[in-house]
Amino acid sequence: MKSTPYMRDLLLYSGQEDNYQVSSERIKKYLRVSADDSQIHRLCIYYGTLLEDELSSLENSVVEKTTELLEDLETEEVIYAMSDGCLLPTRPHQVETEQIGSWKEMKLGRIFREKDHLNLGEKPNLIRSSVYVSHFGKHHDFTSKLSSIIDPLVKLDERLVFINDGALWIANFIAAYYPNATDILDFYHASEYLHEFSKVIFSEKKEAAQKAQWVDKQTLRFFNDEIKEVIKEIEQLKLNGTTKIKAQEKILTYYKNNQLRMLYKSYKDRGLLIGSGPIESAHRFVLQKRMKQSGQKWTKKGGQAIANIRIFHLNNQWDNVVSLINKHTSNAA
């Protein structure tokens, strides 16, 4: 079916919202027009790839979205920058005589203002507006994209707040390019390490109460900026057996590498978030909702193309997609 630019607009929008078969059915139901799912697929890959190819020329408009975050920013207000990766299933590839599929990480960044993060009490918190960036590949390519939209915020110094899981690549990136920013280790990752370690050193059922007491003691230290005391106590544990010793080494390495990012009392005193819930939820509705459905497997090109279209939609920059459609019509499927 030949399609007008407006029809392609609708097909792309539908294709980034749900899988191609569902998109085709919706178009037929709403418009009484037949749109083959393979056509929607080809259009999404074509224009999503063009978005990646022309990202440098579109970069200024993405940067403008970040610059808008600075408008009407209150004197003490902060801007959060969070990033994390989620695993997506990829297409099997031939290795000798075996078909092998794998999971690859797509990285996602989310930037938002403090005032846009709304606490709704018993309901899940709401973030009214965010700027997103994604990359299906190596972390240095992702940080290149990420830095282009964070750079306008560098003048905020400590009011630019990063919250991450402690991955070395993101820690090094922040230290190198935004040394005056506030860098926080997601509290729930810090706590998870503590709980997993406690299961190893208090492995007997009869030690359950002792385990809970020990975890509570260390958690209280977290909220008193006493990470050094936590490290010291773990170091002084006399453990026997390979499993316990390896667990001790693992948690000590993690805490020592991140201790400057674990001053949770100081962060709470400033009224800052200490958890990475916003980026975890973004993974679900930005990427997984569309890209982790039953039976889906992605190529790097296809995965990045769909992510690009979704990102421009969720960044409220669909006009860029429409401009691209009007600019490139003859070669599309």
Region locations from a protein language model:
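Catalytic center-proximal scaffold of phosphoryl-transfer enzymes
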Residues: M1-A333
